[in-house]
């Protein structure tokens, strides 16, 4: 992590509610007004506890906050973190490069037939990846690429 993350009182309240409902500690909370969702980052190995049996914890949390709730499993390795973010079953490789100007760039390789799923409706998954990559690892851009198609830069 390049810098300390500052949380608002609303975000801290949301994290406290998350912990009370799920029993898992949220590492971070991002409120995405544009997509009407709340994204919680949980520590490695705590996804099952956070989700609950049959998604029970997430459903009750969504009912309480009246928004979609999304979870991401944190990892110290930026490539693994991005893979967790964008559905690691659909990703073949993640490369982190440093450009000549010193900024970092992530290149995510996916099967061309699955690219739409990885990017998400209206680019919501790609936007989440860009936001969290910047927040945790100071990665300026995330490229979702497939071997046979053109690169999509975010």
Predicted regions and their residues:
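RNA-contacting regions in translation and RNA-metabolism proteins
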Residues: 1-154
């Amino acid at each position: 992590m390049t810098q300390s993350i500052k949380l608002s009182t609303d975000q801290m309240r949301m994290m406290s509610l998350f912990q009370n409902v799920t029993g898992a500690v949220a590492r971070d909370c991002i409120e995405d007004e544009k997509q009407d969702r709340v994204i919680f980052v949980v520590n490695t190995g705590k996804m099952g506890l956070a989700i609950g049996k049959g998604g029970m914890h997430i459903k009750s949390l969504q009912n309480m906050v009246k928004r979609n709730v999304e979870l991401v499993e944190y990892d110290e390795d930026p490539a693994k973190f991005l893979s967790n973010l964008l559905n690691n079953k659909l990703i073949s490789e993640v490369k982190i490069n440093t450009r000549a100007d010193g900024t970092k760039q992530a290149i995510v390789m996916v099967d061309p037939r699955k690219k739409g799923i990885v990017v998400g409706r209206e680019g919501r998954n790609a936007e989440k990846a860009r936001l969290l990559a910047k927040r945790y690892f100071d990665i300026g851009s995330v490229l979702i690429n497939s071997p046979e198609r053109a690169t999509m830069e975010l």
